[in-house]
């Protein structure tokens, strides 16, 4: 049974209030279904207009895997920051670790990536998440990421 939803739809305006990232390095468009078990789904609509496609690769554009990992981390950051309540609400998130990273299929312009993130551990201000990046329900990348929430 799935955990209850705390935040159904975090739009770009709320993401901008939550994360310090801005263009061209804000790599999620919204986060949906943030649950009480600290899971949620980040959504990224990949456009041919992304700056990375100028060099990756001009004749066959492929969304860089490292940017998918960053998208996972940003999704985890939104989940973590929005899940903390009270006076100790963090204002920043710092990427700490990447483990068990695998790239399975290329992501192309026109694809929509869903970053399915679930907390796998927490110690004080440090959080760890497992993420599966999916396009049309197919896993295209996966990784465990760690981050520290701070003010």
Curated annotation (Swiss-Prot):
Pfam families: FabA. One of its GO terms (cellular component) is membrane. It catalyses: a (3R)-hydroxyacyl-[ACP] = a (2E)-enoyl-[ACP] + H2O. Keywords: Cytoplasm, Lipid A biosynthesis, Lipid biosynthesis, Lipid metabolism, Lyase. Its main location: cytoplasm. It is found in: Cytoplasm. GO terms for biological process: fatty acid biosynthetic process; lipid A biosynthetic process. One of its GO terms (molecular function) is (3R)-hydroxyacyl-[acyl-carrier-protein] dehydratase activity. Its EC number is 4.2.1.59. It is an enzyme of class 4 (lyase). The active site is at 56. CDD domains: FabZ. Involved in unsaturated fatty acids biosynthesis. Catalyzes the dehydration of short chain beta-hydroxyacyl-ACPs and long chain saturated and unsaturated beta-hydroxyacyl-ACPs. Belongs to the thioester dehydratase family. FabZ subfamily. NCBIfam families: fabZ (TIGR01750), PRK00006.1 (NF000582). This is 3-hydroxyacyl-[acyl-carrier-protein] dehydratase FabZ. It comes from Rhodopseudomonas palustris (strain BisA53). The gene is fabZ.
């Amino acid at each position: 049974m799935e955990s209850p939803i705390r935040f159904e739809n975090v739009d770009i305006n709320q993401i901008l209030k939550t994360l310090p990232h801005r263009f061209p390095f804000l790599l999620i468009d919204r986060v949906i279904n943030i649950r009480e078990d600290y899971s949620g789904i980040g959504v990224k609509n990949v456009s041919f207009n992304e700056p990375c496609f100028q060099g990756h690769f001009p004749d066959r554009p492929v969304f860089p895997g490292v940017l998918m990992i960053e998208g996972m981390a940003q999704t985890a950051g939104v989940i973590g920051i929005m899940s903390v309540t009270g006076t100790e609400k963090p204002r920043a998130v710092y990427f700490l670790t990447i483990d068990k990273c695998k790239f399975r299929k290329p992501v192309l312009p026109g694809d929509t990536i869903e970053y399915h993130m679930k907390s796998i551990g927490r110690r004080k201000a440090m959080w760890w998440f497992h993420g599966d990046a999916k396009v049309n329900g197919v896993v295209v990348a996966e990784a465990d990421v760690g981050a520290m929430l701070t003010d």
